């Protein structure tokens, strides 16, 4: 038994399942999870001293790479002044100004401590502003673990084989309507059934919790039009995509203007941060200026704000996003070329600094939750563990996107694609493809 395995056994005695977030338990791929001791640049290092090229990036935030010197120094400087005040600081004002400057649809923003808090609060605000109870989400999209959102959710819920969760009363779930991602007709039919009851649509603009499914042309714009037609708000959940796929998020990349936006991950620089913001007229409904209550002891935490500001400022470097997109494209297209070489049925997707790969014989572009659930999980599990043995760390679930960082250089890309080629050669023999 190696040290990671021993730590996992020890953890299971005191932590449910041995982990503090379900996907980390490796249930989707089998075996024991790696316990990580440190990370630097494009690499993570486990408790046994093994080094891996990392394509998880703490599930998205580490867009500059791990342990970036500017972010680390910003945190060290902030710690000198104390860890938490529970009072306003100049740092949170600067952070709000930075977010508003980088996301044109946001006129005011409220800081929270997680993506779940951000989506939960944005939905409460939408309900309060419209005086309507129902929300509309999409099958396979994940927006955190708030009760109203764990209905046909993606990501960890899919990995566990549970489209929803026990512990959610039917009275809560009945207000959550579920449509088909990339299918405007399914959305319109729900609006026509409940024309005056839907407060908002909430969606991931790139569905990153059923792997990586981009919107088809016109889908986001169609949702904007339906919200306008039926008097609902459009909430774009950019917790994952915000500053990951483009400077102004996926909404800037695809040219759609939401009423509210949720953020997280990248804006924290690796620290626990979430945010929700939008039009001033809507945001004024949040306490203390309005009747919709939201609060948090650690909201706007000075250490988190310092880390986030350092990362956001670094992201303004000219040419950064085109360079990140080019790296991501090389990995995705390189994987596809290797798969074709070895007759491995594989489909790929990529946008900005996110990518997805799917072991499927479906020749159509990957656009739906239904397609993802039909992918070959046996192939994925084999590929996952073989890549791990080659020193490449991918998300341990077929329902999670991959992430690159600016720290992934020529050597890392070349080593990764060499490993992919080697593993696909193994798979061709192992599965008689």
UniProtKB/Swiss-Prot annotation:
Database matches in InterPro entries: 4pyrrol_synth_GluAld_NH2Trfase (IPR004639), Aminotrans_3 (IPR005814), Aminotrans_3_PPA_site (IPR049704), PyrdxlP-dep_Trfase (IPR015424), PyrdxlP-dep_Trfase_major (IPR015421), PyrdxlP-dep_Trfase_small (IPR015422)
Modification sites for N6-(pyridoxal phosphate)lysine: 265
One GO cellular component term: cytoplasm
Catalytic activity line of the entry: (S)-4-amino-5-oxopentanoate = 5-aminolevulinate
Entry annotated with the keyword Lipoprotein: no
EC number(s) on file: 5.4.3.8
Domain of life: Bacteria
Keywords of this entry: Cytoplasm, Isomerase, Porphyrin biosynthesis, Pyridoxal phosphate
GO MF, one annotated term: transaminase activity
Disulfide links within the chain: none
Compartments, record wording: Cytoplasm
Keyword Cytoplasm belongs to the record: yes
Cofactor(s) for this UniProt protein: pyridoxal 5'-phosphate
Annotated pathway: Porphyrin-containing compound metabolism; protoporphyrin-IX biosynthesis; 5-aminolevulinate from L-glutamyl-tRNA(Glu): step 2/2
Primary localization: cytoplasm
Gene3D superfamilies: Aspartate Aminotransferase, domain 1, Type I PLP-dependent aspartate aminotransferase-like (Major domain)
Database matches in SUPFAM superfamilies: PLP-dependent transferases
Self-association and partners: Homodimer.
NCBIfam families linked to this entry: hemL, PRK00062.1
HAMAP family: HemL_aminotrans_3
Protein name listed in UniProt: Glutamate-1-semialdehyde 2,1-aminomutase
Species per Swiss-Prot/TrEMBL record: Shewanella denitrificans (strain OS217 / ATCC BAA-1090 / DSM 15013)
């Amino acid at each position: 038994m190696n040290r990671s395995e021993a730590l996992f056994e020890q953890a299971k005695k005191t932590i449910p399942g041995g982990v503090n977030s379900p996907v980390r338990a490796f249930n989707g791929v089998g075996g024991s999870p790696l316990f990580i001791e440190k990370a630097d640049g494009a690499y993570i290092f486990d408790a046994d001293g093994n080094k891996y090229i990392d394509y998880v990036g703490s599930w998205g935030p580490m867009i500059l790479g791990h342990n970036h010197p500017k972010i680390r120094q910003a945190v060290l400087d902030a710690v000198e002044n104390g860890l938490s005040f529970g009072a306003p600081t100049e740092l949170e004002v600067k952070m709000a100004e930075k977010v508003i400057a980088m996301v044109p649809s946001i006129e005011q923003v409220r800081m929270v401590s997680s993506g779940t808090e951000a989506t939960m609060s944005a939905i409460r605000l939408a309900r309060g502003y419209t005086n309507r109870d129902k929300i509309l989400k999409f099958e396979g999209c994940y927006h955190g673990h708030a009760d109203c959102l764990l209905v046909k959710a993606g990501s960890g819920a899919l990995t566990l084989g549970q489209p929803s969760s026990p512990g959610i009363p039917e009275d809560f779930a009945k207000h959550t309507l579920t449509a088909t991602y990339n299918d405007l007709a399914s959305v319109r039919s729900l609006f026509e059934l409940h024309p005056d009851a839907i407060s908002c649509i909430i969606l991931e603009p790139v569905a990153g919790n059923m792997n990586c499914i981009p919107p088809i042309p016109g889908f986001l714009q169609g949702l904007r039009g339906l919200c306008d037609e039926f008097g609902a708000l459009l909430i774009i959940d950019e917790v994952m995509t915000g500053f990951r796929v483009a400077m102004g998020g996926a909404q800037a990349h695809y040219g759609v203007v939401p009423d509210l936006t949720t953020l997280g991950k990248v804006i924290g620089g690796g620290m626990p941060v979430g945010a929700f913001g939008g039009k001033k007229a809507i945001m004024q409904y949040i306490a203390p200026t309005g009747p919709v209550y939201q609060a948090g002891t650690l909201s706007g935490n000075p250490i988190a704000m310092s880390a986030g500001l350092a990362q956001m400022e670094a992201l303004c470097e000219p040419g950064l996003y085109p360079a990140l997109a080019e790296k991501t494209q090389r990995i995705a297209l390189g994987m596809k070329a290797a798969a074709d070489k070895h007759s491995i049925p594989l489909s790929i997707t990529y946008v900005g600094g996110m990518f997805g790969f799917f072991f499927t014989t479906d020749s159509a572009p990957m656009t739906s939750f239904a397609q993802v659930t039909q992918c070959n999980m046996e192939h994925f599990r084999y590929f996952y563990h073989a890549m791990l043995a080659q020193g490449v760390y991918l998300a341990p679930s077929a329902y999670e996107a991959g992430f690159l960082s600016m720290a992934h250089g020529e050597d890392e890309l070349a080593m990764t694609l060499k490993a992919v080629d080697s593993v696909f050669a193994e798979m061709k023999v192992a599965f008689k493809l």
